[in-house]
Amino acid sequence: MRTENEYKGSNPTTSKMDQSQTSAFFEVQGKVKDFSYAGSVGMTRAWFKESEEDHAYYTFTPTVRLSYNLKKAGFLRYRFNISPAIPSLGSLTDVEQAMDTIQIVRGNPLLKTYQQFTNSLSYSYSKKQFNANLSVRHQYYDNPIMESIFVEDGKLILKDENQRSFQSLNTELMAGINGATLFGLKDFLTLYASGGYTRSWSEGLNYSHMYDEFYYSVMAQVQYKG
């Protein structure tokens, strides 16, 4: 695949890039009584070339899924996976683009791919029309690509760089009833409510941020069949 980008301005530039990607994948799964398991692994090679410079990225993508049937007490599920993030063609381009009189977006051919690690654990329970689910998820990005902003020769430079890390922790609870009979009307009401909390940490090359978020939602639906 080939992409061609033309940047116009005081210094017009044409950037041409070639790209190819090759992947292989393998999966195995099984079950022992109430315990189920599955595992998969993939390997991907991504290649980019601009002018005389080329970059090759190799990514490893394993996934593990486990589940246990607690029968009347519900289901317990666990999932772990590693997924790669490859720099975009636009970020790799060795080009400066003026956004206005003071802001310049600068490409970075030295960007490296990074890994995203995700662990998730969930418990679900249902009885008749009642359903509930509790989940916990943790994500960790190792040397993620995030924007750096700095001043150079009186200009504000915006540049993607591999930073130190990013991680988030999320907990969410959902509960509701589906098709409940109300006022003698069968399957009249469906009601669900959910709420959660997320904490995120960003560790840059010369900065750090922490962000907390609480959220909730309520969904109600009534249905009448004459």
Regions found by a protein language model. Give the residues of each.
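Membrane-embedded beta-strand positions in outer-membrane beta-barrel channels/transporters
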Residues: 21-27, 61-63, 77, 108, ...
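Outer-membrane beta-barrel signature, preferentially recognizing the C-terminal barrel domain
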Residues: 17, 84-133, 140, 158-174, ...
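Outer-membrane beta-barrel translocator domains and adjoining extracellular loop/strand segments
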Residues: 2-13, 49-57, 89-97, 102-104, ...
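Outer membrane beta-barrel strand-and-loop segments of large Gram-negative receptors
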Residues: 112, 131-223
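Surface-exposed extracellular loop regions of Gram-negative outer-membrane beta-barrel proteins
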Residues: 17-53, 57-67, 188-197, 216-226
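A short, compositionally biased micro-patch
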Residues: 69-71, 114
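Transmembrane beta-strands of outer-membrane beta-barrel pores
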Residues: 2, 32-34, 43-49, 56, ...
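Repeated loop/turn-to-beta-strand initiation elements of outer-membrane beta-barrel proteins
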Residues: 34-39, 72-76, 129-132, 181-191, ...
